[in-house]
Every structure is written in C-alpha cells, then in structure tokens.
Amino acid sequence: MEIKAEEISEIIRKQIKEYGTEVAVAETGTIISIGDGIARIHGLDKAMAGELLEFPGGITGMVLNLEEDNVGAAILGEFSEIKEGDSVKLTGKIVEVPVGPALIGRVVDAIGNPIDGLGPINTDTFGKVEVKAPGIVKRKSVHQPMQTGLKAIDSMVPIGRGQRELIIGDRQTGKTAVAIDTIINQKGGDVVCIYVAIGQKRSTVAQVVSKLKEHGAMDYTIVVAATASEPAPLQFIAPYTGVTMGEFFRDSGKHALIIYDDLSKQAVAYRQLSLLLRRPPGREAYPGDVFYLHSRLLERACKVSDDCGAGSLTALPVIETQAGDVSAYIPTNVISITDGQIYLESDLFYSGVRPAINVGLSVSRVGGSAQVKAMKQVAGTLRLALAQYREMAAFAQFGSDLDKATQMQLARGARLVEILKQPQYRPIPNEKQVLIIFAANNGFVDEYPIGSLGRYETELYAFFDSRKATLLGELRDKKAIDDAMKGEIIASLEEFKKEFTA
C-alpha cells in the first residue's frame, strides 16, 4: 500500500482549518440533602427562581427556594437514584414542555413525556410552563357558548368560551362525570380538550381514557396524568403543563377546553412541597401564596381579542369539598378566582337527581351573554320556577290540604326536576334541549306520570329526528325562536301528544 504524503497533508490541513475550540461552561453545585422530592444544593450562586436543573441520570429539577447558602429545588421525576454529594448543573432555561397538534390523542406525564406506549411525540414546539397571563388589552369579553350537552348546565348555568367555571362538590357527587360529558359533547366541533388528572388513582385515569376512546373523544383530547403515586412536585406542576398545551391552541386562534381534576390535590401537593422547603405555614397549614398558585394558573384561561387571533381557552377546575364545607380555605379561594361555580350536592345525588346540581348555589357570572338565544328564551324562568318549587315542597311537607294552584306548581316543579335529569355519557345537542324544556314549560308533560318522562323525552327526540328534521335543523341554525317557529313547535308537540301513551 502506497502512502501519499500530499493526501495526508491535505487531510491534516483541512482538519486544522475546521478545528474550533468550544468549551462548555456550566455552573455546578453539590447536593447537601435530599428526600421527599426535595433537594438542597450548595454552590449554585447564579441560580434563578424557576430555573431548570439537571440531576444525574438525566432527571430534571426546578429551583423553588433561593436561600443564603443553598438552593431548594423540586425534583421532577424519580429521585431514588439521586444521593447526597451528587453534582447538579444549571441549564439557564425555564421548565418547558412539548406543545402542538402532535400531542392530541396522547396520554402524557406531568412534564409531557408519553406514558401510553404509543412511541415518542414528534414535535419541535415547546412552551414555557410559567408564563404571564394575557394582559387586559389582549382580552375580549366572553360571547360564544361552550356547550356541555347537559340540560341543567346549558339552561341555567351557561358556560362561554374563555370562561373559568368551577365544578365543586363532595367526593362521589359526579364532578368528573360533568367534565367528561363536556369533553364528549365537543365531538365534531372545533374544540381541543385537555384533561389534567392530579393525584388520582391510575385505575381511575385508565378508566377515563378508555371511556374517552369508546366515545371517539380521544381524537381531539390530550390527557396529562400526575397520579397519586407520583412525587408531589409532579402533581404540583401538572396543571401548568396542561395549560401550556392549551395556550398553544388559544394563541393559534383555535378554541381549547381544559379540565383540572382536581385542584384540591394540587394544593395539598404544594403544601407538602412548601413545608418540606421550610416555608412558613398559614391557614390550614397552606403556604401564604396558595391563592397565587391557583390565580396565576386560572388567569391564563381567557377569550383572546380579534387582533390577537380570537382564540379561547376555557377552564373547568374541579374542587373537592369535605362534608359540603364551601367556606374552607381552598374552595373560597377558587370560587373568588373563577367566573362562577357549578355546585354538586350529595343529598341530590343520592336522591336520584343526576347531575346533582344545586341550582340555588350554582351561578355563571359571564356565561349569560354567551348563551344561545333560543335557550335563553325557553329557560329564562326555569331557575325561578325550580327555586319556588323547592320552597313550596319544603312547606308542603307540613300541610296536607293544598289549594289547586299550589298543587299545580308542585306537579310542574317535580316534572321540571325530572326533565333535567340525564344519564352519564349521553350529552344532548342544544336544539333538543330547547325542545324538551319548551315542552315542560308549556305544560305538555303535566298530564304524564313522572316515571314515564324519560321515555317521553327519548320518543320526542326520535319523533323530531324522523318526522320534523327540517324544524330541528332550522332551530339549530337560527339559534332563536320567532313567532312562526314557536307555532310550528307547539303544533309538532300537539301531534306527538296524540301518539304518545304514558
């Protein structure tokens, strides 16, 4: 083999030309104590609050406390392999998570890593977990409806796109059911849904995902799961991860819906973190900034002005109360941050009224301006009628001889309560909700026994689908009832009345 000196010298010359000295400088510190997902690190003098840290084994952390001689950090992942004396690097970055359409249909953990076994997520877009909420100029008042498909909510506690509506109630009152039905109702629409599970059992999350798949809802849904077995830092950061993913769609001019299930568990995780970081405890041992924890999260859900893309992010946070105590610390905080609440009551739930919405305590502060006009026309008196019925029913327990008018009002009220009941996973389109409430308000169901009203409703929908499809379509498109349409609806209901036998 012949060695050519020119060739070798040419290669050496080329390599010298391309040679560049790049020295990577990273500030490192040493772990002085670790446990319960919290590490104290000495030597990170240039660390910034909220900065991302790199621990051995590719695990990341987040700076939470800046103290005189050390830094307190939350470890975002499994910390059993990390030990005292290990070195930690500053990254100079803030915690980021993957965002974009590639996440739709996937189940990810609290920092955006896929956990559904469907391979990696192909996206180059990342979003910062902690960003400032849009300012006043960038916002617009809520004016478009966000249909839940639940008669009791769409008629009396309407939700608009960009609203924050709290779902509050004791355990096992159907809070998650309301949220899941709302997701299922977005099928065929233009809303991307994000379901954030915080501190729930893995079996529960798996059940939710399988229900969403069964109803074809995973085609437009992202699930972020920080289950009960995850360390507290991951349960604390999961809602911020979810809202970052939602903001991508909001800022792209699209519409998104995010459900935090539930923020009570996030507050508990944050309390645990704060106490371990030795921050001074306040009321109920929560840290002083627990209000800010939720306010900065929920302020990121809004309706964006037309100049900024006209997108929206609607938030449905869930709060679990203890024995119906709405005046506890976290419930009062979140009630004051949100634009209204849907209050679910265990007494109603056990008496068979499902969804178990207490109409008297539930309110939507901004949704009224977003409600479909047809629904506003038929449901305007509904809340008052139900309130009067509840009051009369309470008095009627004491007296037996009631006058005719009172008896009629009680009968009508009982039928309204029955009409507003709805089975789970069966959201109803808005035009059909309008029909059944119109029928109940105008006395079309008064003569039937309460037990047959479920069948009346099912058969009424089938009748309109098969024989009055044009009228139904007109109601769907116009979204309002004029005199001519009112006459048509009454005539159709009279026609159905002749055919229906209780």
UniProtKB/Swiss-Prot annotation:
Looking up Gene3D superfamilies in the UniProt record yields: 2.40.30.20, ATP synthase alpha/beta chain, C-terminal domain, P-loop containing nucleotide triphosphate hydrolases
Subcellular localization is given as:
Cell inner membrane
Keywords of this entry: ATP synthesis, ATP-binding, Cell inner membrane, Cell membrane, CF(1), Hydrogen ion transport, Ion transport, Membrane, Nucleotide-binding, Translocase, Transport
Residues bound to ATP are 169-176
Q: Name one GO molecular function term.
A: ATP binding
- Annotated InterPro entries: ATP_synth_asu-like_sf, ATP_synth_asu_C, ATP_synth_asu_C_sf, ATP_synth_F1_a_nt-bd_dom, ATP_synth_F1_asu, ATPase_a/bsu_AS, ATPase_F1/V1/A1_a/bsu_N, ATPase_F1/V1/A1_a/bsu_N_sf
Source domain of life: Bacteria
Give the record's GO CC terms: plasma membrane; proton-transporting ATP synthase complex
**CDD domains this protein is in?**
ATP-synt_F1_alpha_C, ATP-synt_F1_alpha_N, F1-ATPase_alpha_CD
Q: Where is this site: Required for activity?
A: 362
Reactions this protein catalyses: ATP + H2O + 4 H(+)(in) = ADP + phosphate + 5 H(+)(out)
Quaternary context = F-type ATPases have 2 components, CF(1) - the catalytic core - and CF(0) - the membrane proton channel. CF(1) has five subunits: alpha(3), beta(3), gamma(1), delta(1), epsilon(1). CF(0) has three main subunits: a(1), b(2) and c(9-12). The alpha and beta chains form an alternating ring which encloses part of the gamma chain. CF(1) is attached to CF(0) by a central stalk formed by the gamma and epsilon chains, while a peripheral stalk is formed by the delta and b chains.
What role is this protein assigned?
Produces ATP from ADP in the presence of a proton gradient across the membrane. The alpha chain is a regulatory subunit.
Per the record, the similarity remark reads: Belongs to the ATPase alpha/beta chains family.
What's the protein called, per UniProt?
A: ATP synthase subunit alpha
Give the species this sequence originates from: Geobacter sp. (strain M21)
Upper lineage is: Bacteria, Pseudomonadati, Thermodesulfobacteriota, Desulfuromonadia, Geobacterales
